[in-house]
């Protein structure tokens, strides 16, 4: 399959270092709000990359909170990503908003959030999603789809109203050490503004595309 001629020339906006926030979290929040306003497809979807047994692995996960400390998502702690994080507590996140010709890359240490925070979020989920968290042994082999459906039915019968949070399910927060903002520009002369955390302070610099 020849893909050589598939390309786009980006020209919608430019990214000025002088106009970027001093705090990259604030810059991210601004860009995320603009992606939501522009009705970008799945604006909170991000690629989460981890390393397990020395090999990189990645998957798409939804961002559920951004705060001054970092970026929060929820998952099954016994999944492959959970195993990778247990073994190597660092992750890289990538957001891509094609509608705005923008991308954000985030790298940092990752740790579990408190059980209380996970409980609050789990309680806010739809009933069927809470049932699914119990029914799915994420990343494990199934004999067939019917096995999963039957298990979900058993969980629903056991918990017709209140579904408690499984102990193996909860949130992680990525504590950023490096955040890069990418804005597509004509002739592949893209804008790249990178923030690095050095001794507790953010340093901002422009990178060559």
Swiss-Prot record:
UniProt-recorded name of the protein: Pyridoxine/pyridoxamine 5'-phosphate oxidase
Co-factor note (free text): Binds 1 FMN per subunit.
NCBIfam families reported in the protein's UniProt record: pdxH, PRK05679.1
Alphabetized UniProt keyword annotations: Flavoprotein, FMN, Oxidoreductase, Pyridoxine biosynthesis
PROSITE patterns in UniProt: PYRIDOX_OXIDASE
EC numbers on record: 1.4.3.5
GO annotation terms (biological process): pyridoxine biosynthetic process
Family recorded in the similarity comment: Belongs to the pyridoxamine 5'-phosphate oxidase family.
Catalytic activity, reaction form: pyridoxamine 5'-phosphate + O2 + H2O = pyridoxal 5'-phosphate + H2O2 + NH4(+); pyridoxine 5'-phosphate + O2 = pyridoxal 5'-phosphate + H2O2
InterPro entries registered for this protein in UniProt: Pyridox_Oxase (IPR000659), Pyridox_Oxase_CS (IPR019740), Pyridox_Oxase_N (IPR011576), Pyridoxamine_oxidase_dimer_C (IPR019576), Split_barrel_FMN-bd (IPR012349)
Positions of transmembrane segments: none
Function text: Catalyzes the oxidation of either pyridoxine 5'-phosphate (PNP) or pyridoxamine 5'-phosphate (PMP) into pyridoxal 5'-phosphate (PLP).
Chain positions recorded as substrate binding sites: 7-10, 64, 121, 125, 129, 188-190
GO MF annotation list: FMN binding; pyridoxamine phosphate oxidase activity
Subunit (UniProt): Homodimer.
Binding site for FMN: 59-64, 74-75, 80-81, 138-139, 182, 192
Involved pathway(s): Cofactor metabolism; pyridoxal 5'-phosphate salvage; pyridoxal 5'-phosphate from pyridoxamine 5'-phosphate: step 1/1; Cofactor metabolism; pyridoxal 5'-phosphate salvage; pyridoxal 5'-phosphate from pyridoxine 5'-phosphate: step 1/1
Cofactor(s) of this protein: FMN
